[in-house]
């Protein structure tokens, strides 16, 4: 849907339905079309004769075809057909095979009335194939219905042939008259920018109560992460409301909805989404009447809730039982992941009255029994954009405006989504992609991982824009009914908004919706994204490929084992129209090693709880980490002295161990297996001898049982011990005999384990309490050159060779900025090509090599010096000192800063102490009175003088009073405005002139009464003309009121009676003069021009 992209291949049933409603006498769209009446015949392979292809002839009229010899009779539902079709001077041979890949076996169109009644299942009457002798050709036909005629599309390159039976013909399609039309495909162009509509969407969220106490363990959940697959299928139920079915008609509504859902399918195939989402319709329900349990009205939320309950009762059912899919028998209802209800009822958000809302959905409701619903208003083919937007909410996508990084841009999930673009022009934002990935990684999306095995998806059809299938007239009929046509006098504006004329109306009307992309708007032009642009070729098929991996991120930890990641983008090149998305993952994680953490440092999980505790306004130091077994990568913290953990974060930081004694790490919220080779997901394990991926032959296992113990204690010869001196230790880890010993106690059961190797002899002691004992089972290993613990060294056999080897690498000396790793030099014994690590004393010290050195952690440091604010000067007058805190900190992935060693920070340490000079005592500022506001009409400033009274001018600048301040004054905004003087009220002698005098605001132009009355200009003045005839008294028309009427006179009000008024000499009466001002004014003028009578 972004610029230059195209629609993916259309699904077969949509193309078939596009031609069912054509009038035989009407061409499709505005493209040139030929019409013929032909007789298709079924033939045998021996009857096929492929002559050379002639050039395409010009337009033709109807002709009657010849009748070929007898052929096999076609029977509906056959698997394969070979048809002969004489068309436009050519013999076309159609090789067809029955094709049901676009439907699930359980798909059906159901018409439901007052009593629920299922329609018959779809017939096995859909065929697809090719035209023999025409490489790249495509045929999609149906032979459905009682009449059994052929309906569908034949495509030969850029030429399309539409076929349907004549209305007056009956019988099987073989040998039956059919009407064919030929049109030439047009090439699409890159889209232009579109306009934003003001249409509203409402997303409903589920309110969750906070969980206290230990979280419950859902038996359906597993520790292993749900891996993000490259393809997911949303099996969708679509229900058409009764008012929509009545408006369009059942057949047209079926065609319309399938076309819309195909557009929705194409939008979710767009490369910008990054994940292939198949929106597949499993059932279409056409309501003849609304069921009693389904309440649809103006209140949007109530309508959506009612539909959700109704669809769950009618078409719901358990999709999963634990982690097992419910088997699908032939009588089972089709699986439903989402449900869409389309209505022509105008609904609204939060109120029970019509408004501009066009869609409502539950956020993240897919797969939920009573939240997987979308409510959409039928507003023409733009319904596709509404459904795509709301299904995005259903799949966990928020509005782009909810993300600061995506706000203010034009994408499908914009708060006011862009209308006027089609699926080839609209794209998904990176925030929508991230929201979708997070939703699909959650366990609530598991229904999308299993698709109805009866479903088939693909069919190879050419890319077409929707406006190439619906002409402007047909789009008007969808919006305003079958009596509507396109307004030709609005053709110059048609791409900005589709204007239609309904039969019987005198003016055109519009819903401000642009026509579909591909609608012709002139010679070699069509509408794209709301503009009329030239046609350009369709881009070629291009599969996406990955860009090179980016640089590794910083390690998530400053000490110990952590995780880092790197990213790549599918833009080298990006997937083109119909192209596939890049296979594999866009993010890769790896283990990173740092220097061991200092002793006494809290665990990484505890540090995260403490960081949250520091940010909390409550008392500090109260939270400690708790690992929940079935949710190891969620951060639970427990208040001190309480056993109820609190969920603090949905996931811990990358590199957090999954448990206190585990090597597996949490990465992106999922517990990942870490092999002994340090690779995420590796299956490498240490053998019993502690060798990674070893065969267990380098050591000898010693084990046995001892049955005289009640409690156990462990002690080395260096006096380190556990449970000694009659003291019982808490479970944990202890450093004894040069190794880490782990002690676990559960009730009376105890376990002591250590990885080794030990450097001192260990003594296992038994503490005897009471009389009952439970026994001890022990196991330990010794190198093959030793037989038992504390046994003296055996003599070295003559065939043994002891040499120094580099057995491994130490950790990096620094965590960033470039450090060194050194090899571990070990003594190795070689016997019969078998190597074994032995004590260093077995090898000669004189030949011990120097360790090898390698550079490591070359990435820049994220550690930096952080300096706090300076303290106040130690002296209030004269010289003193200031102090501040300077710390070396490291930034974690979540933005939290933790203190680290000063050697990790680059550059010199900022100064922590500096000299300062206190302000001289008794230094004060002096300010004068405020001046008048600098503006008399609007905003201005007050000003005053501010001076330092100290002789040296060392007043504290931070306490200096303001010298300017904003002010507003509107006292001088009104003034007198005058109009032009009118013509003189008299044509002779003395008269009056008038003008308009008004008090108006300088800025707004509004009338007011604040102007000074003394300065008001005169509204009247005297004027003088030539001397008048004495017979007419000039004063009768020179009064101010009569002059004003004369000035304002435009025409007579009583045209019929004004001649009588003049003859009866009634013009001097102001009441009659006002109604016949033009006649009376001319009467006086003529009187003044007449000469006086002879005396």
Curated annotation (Swiss-Prot):
Residue stretches making up the Peptidase M12B domain: 232-452
Residues given in the record as Zn(2+) binding sites: 201, 389, 393, 399
The enzyme's E.C. designation: 3.4.24.-
Domain called TSP type-1: residue spans: 543-598, 800-860, 861-922, 925-968, 972-1029
Signal peptide location: 1-27
Region named Spacer: 702-779
Gene3D superfamilies, sorted: 2.60.120.830, 3.40.1620.60, Collagenase (Catalytic Domain), Thrombospondin type-1 (TSP1) repeat
Domain annotation PLAC: ranges: 1045-1084
SS bonds (residue pairs): 308-373, 348-355, 367-447, 406-431, 476-500, 487-508, 495-527, 521-532, 555-592, 559-597, 570-582, 873-916, 877-921, 888-905
Cellular compartment(s): Secreted, Extracellular space, Extracellular matrix
Tissue distribution of the protein: Isoform 1 and isoform 2 are expressed at high levels in the lung, brain, whole eye and retina. Isoform 1 shows a weaker expression in the heart, kidney and skeletal muscle. Isoform 2 shows a weaker expression in the kidney, bone marrow and skeletal muscle. Isoform 1 and isoform 2 are expressed at high levels in the fetal heart, kidney, and whole eye, whereas a weak expression is seen in the fetal liver.
Keyword Magnesium tagged: no
Region of interest called Disordered, as start-end residue ranges on this chain: 50-76
A Gene Ontology term for the protein's cellular component: extracellular matrix
Keyword Endoplasmic reticulum: no
UniProt PTM comment: The precursor is cleaved by a furin endopeptidase. Glycosylated. Can be O-fucosylated by POFUT2 on a serine or a threonine residue found within the consensus sequence C1-X(2)-(S/T)-C2-G of the TSP type-1 repeat domains where C1 and C2 are the first and second cysteine residue of the repeat, respectively. Fucosylated repeats can then be further glycosylated by the addition of a beta-1,3-glucose residue by the glucosyltransferase, B3GALTL. Fucosylation mediates the efficient secretion of ADAMTS family members.
Motif (Cysteine switch) on chain: 199-206
Disease field: Weill-Marchesani syndrome 4: An autosomal recessive syndrome characterized by lenticular myopia, ectopia lentis, glaucoma, spherophakia and short stature. Brachydactyly and decreased joint flexibility are present in some patients.
Domain comment, as recorded: The conserved cysteine present in the cysteine-switch motif binds the catalytic zinc ion, thus inhibiting the enzyme. The dissociation of the cysteine from the zinc ion upon the activation-peptide release activates the enzyme.
Protein name (record): A disintegrin and metalloproteinase with thrombospondin motifs 17
Organism field: Homo sapiens (Human)
């Amino acid at each position: 849907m972004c610029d230059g992209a195209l629609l993916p291949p259309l699904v077969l049933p949509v193309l078939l339905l596009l031609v069912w409603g054509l009038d035989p006498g009407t061409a499709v769209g505005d493209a040139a079309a030929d019409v013929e009446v032909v007789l298709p015949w079924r033939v045998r392979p021996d009857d096929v004769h492929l002559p050379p292809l002639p050039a395409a002839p010009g337009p033709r009229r109807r002709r009657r075809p010849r009748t070929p010899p007898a052929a096999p009779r076609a029977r509906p539902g056959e698997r394969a057909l070979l048809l002969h079709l004489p068309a436009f001077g050519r013999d076309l041979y159609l090789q067809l095979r029955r094709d049901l890949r676009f439907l699930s076996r359980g798909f059906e169109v159901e018409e439901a009335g007052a009593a629920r009644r299922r329609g018959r299942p779809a017939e096995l009457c859909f065929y697809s194939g090719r035209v023999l002798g025409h490489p790249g050709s495509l045929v999609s036909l149906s032979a459905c219905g009682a009449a059994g005629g052929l309906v569908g599309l034949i495509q030969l390159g850029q030429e399309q042939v539409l076929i349907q039976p004549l209305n007056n013909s009956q019988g099987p399609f073989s040998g039956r008259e059919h009407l064919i039309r030929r049109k030439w495909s047009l090439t699409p162009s890159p889209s232009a920018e579109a306009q934003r509509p003001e249409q509203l969407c409402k997303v409903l969220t589920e309110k969750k109560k906070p969980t206290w106490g230990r979280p419950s363990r859902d038996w359906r959940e597993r520790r292993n992460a749900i891996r993000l697959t490259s393809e997911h299928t949303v099996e969708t139920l679509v229900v058409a409301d009764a008012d929509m079915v009545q408006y369009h008609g059942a057949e047209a509504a079926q065609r319309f909805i399938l076309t819309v859902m195909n557009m929705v399918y194409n939008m979710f195939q767009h490369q910008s989404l990054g994940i292939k989402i198949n929106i597949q319709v499993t059932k279409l329900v056409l309501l003849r009447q609304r069921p009693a349990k389904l309440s649809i009205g103006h209140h949007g939320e109530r309508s959506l809730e009612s539909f959700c309950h109704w669809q769950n009762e009618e078409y719901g059912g358990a999709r999963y039982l634990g982690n097992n899919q419910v088997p699908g028998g032939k009588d089972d209802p089709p699986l439903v992941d989402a449900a869409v209800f389309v209505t022509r009822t105008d609904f609204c958000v939060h109120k029970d009255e019509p408004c501009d809302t066009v869609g409502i959905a539950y956020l993240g409701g897919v797969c939920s029994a009573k939240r997987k619903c979308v409510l959409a208003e039928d507003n023409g083919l733009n319904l596709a954009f509404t459904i795509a937007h709301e299904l995005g909410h259903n799949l966990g996508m928020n509005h782009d405006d909810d993300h600061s990084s995506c706000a203010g841009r034009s994408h499908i999930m914009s708060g006011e989504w862009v209308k006027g673009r089609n699926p080839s022009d609209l794209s998904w934002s990176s925030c929508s992609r991230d929201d979708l990935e997070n939703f699909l990684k959650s366990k609530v999306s598991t229904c999308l991982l299993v698709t109805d095995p009866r479903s088939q998806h693909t069919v190879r059809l050419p890319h077409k824009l929707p406006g190439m299938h619906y002409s402007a007239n047909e789009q008007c009929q969808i919006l305003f009914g079958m009596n509507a046509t396109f307004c030709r006098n609005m053709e110059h504006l048609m791409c900005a908004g589709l204007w239609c004329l309904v039969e019987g109306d005198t003016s055109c009307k519009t819903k401000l919706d642009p026509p579909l992309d591909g609608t012709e708007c002139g010679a070699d032009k069509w509408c794209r994204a709301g503009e009329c642009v030239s046609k350009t070729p369709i881009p070629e098929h291009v599969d996406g490929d990955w860009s090179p991996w980016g640089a590794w991120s910083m390690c998530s930890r400053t000490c110990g084992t952590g995780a880092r990641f790197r990213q790549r983008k599918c833009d080298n090149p990006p997937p083109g129209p119909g192209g596939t998305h890049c296979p594999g993952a866009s993010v890769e994680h790896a283990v990173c090693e740092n220097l061991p953490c200092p002793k006494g440092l809290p665990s990484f999980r505890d540090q995260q709880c403490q960081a949250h505790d520091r940010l909390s306004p409550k008392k500090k130091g109260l939270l400690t980490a708790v690992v929940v077994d079935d949710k190891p990568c969620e951060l639970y913290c427990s208040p001190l002295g309480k056993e109820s953990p609190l969920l603090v974060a949905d996931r811990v930081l990358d590199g957090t161990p999954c448990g206190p004694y585990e090597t597996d790490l949490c990465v992106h919220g999922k517990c990942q297996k870490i092999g002994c080779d340090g690779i995420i997901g590796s299956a490498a394990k240490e053998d019993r001898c502690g060798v990674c991926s070893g065969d267990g032959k380098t050591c000898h296992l010693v084990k046995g049982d001892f049955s005289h113990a009640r409690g156990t204690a462990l002690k080395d010869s260096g006096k380190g011990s556990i449970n000694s001196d009659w003291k019982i230790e808490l479970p944990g880890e202890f450093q004894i005999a040069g190794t880490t010993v782990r002690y676990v106690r559960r009730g009376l059961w105890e376990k002591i384990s250590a990885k080794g190797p030990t450097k001192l002899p260990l003594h296992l002691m038994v503490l005897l309490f009471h009389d009952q004992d439970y026994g001890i089972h022990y196991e330990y290993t010794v190198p093959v050159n030793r037989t038992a613990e504390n046994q003296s060294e055996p003599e070295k056999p003559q065939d043994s060779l002891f040499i120094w080897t580099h057995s491994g690498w130490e950790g990096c000396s620094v965590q960033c900025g470039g450090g060194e790793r050194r090899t571990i030099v070990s003594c190795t014994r070689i016997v019969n090509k078998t190597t074994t690590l032995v004590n260093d004393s077995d090898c000669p010290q004189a030949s011990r090599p120097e360790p090898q050195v390698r550079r490591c952690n070359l990435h820049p440091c994220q550690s930096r010096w952080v300096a706090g604010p300076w303290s106040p000067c130690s002296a209030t007058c004269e010289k003193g000192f200031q102090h501040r805190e300077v710390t070396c900190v490291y930034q974690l992935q979540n933005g939290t800063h933790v203190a680290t060693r000063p050697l990790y920070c680059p550059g010199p340490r900022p100064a922590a102490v500096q000299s300062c000079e206190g302000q001289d005592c008794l230094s004060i500022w002096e300010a004068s009175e405020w001046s008048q506001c600098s503006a008399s009409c609007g905003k201005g400033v007050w000003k005053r003088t501010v001076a330092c009274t100290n002789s040296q001018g060392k007043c504290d600048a931070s306490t200096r009073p303001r010298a300017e301040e904003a002010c507003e004054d509107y006292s001088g905004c009104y003034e007198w405005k005058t109009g032009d003087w009118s013509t003189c009220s008299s044509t002779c002698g003395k008269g009056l002139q008038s003008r308009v005098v008004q008090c108006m605001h300088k800025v707004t132009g509004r009338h007011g009464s604040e102007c000074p009355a003394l300065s008001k200009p005169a509204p009247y003045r005297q004027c003088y003309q030539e001397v008048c005839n004495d017979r007419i008294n000039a004063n009768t028309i020179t009064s101010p009121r009569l002059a004003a009427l004369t000035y304002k006179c435009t025409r007579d009000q009583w045209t019929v009676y004004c001649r009588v008024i003049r003859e009866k000499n009634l013009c001097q009466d102001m009441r009659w003069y006002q109604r016949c001002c033009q006649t009376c004014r001319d009467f006086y003028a003529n009187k003044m021009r007449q000469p006086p009578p002879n005396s």
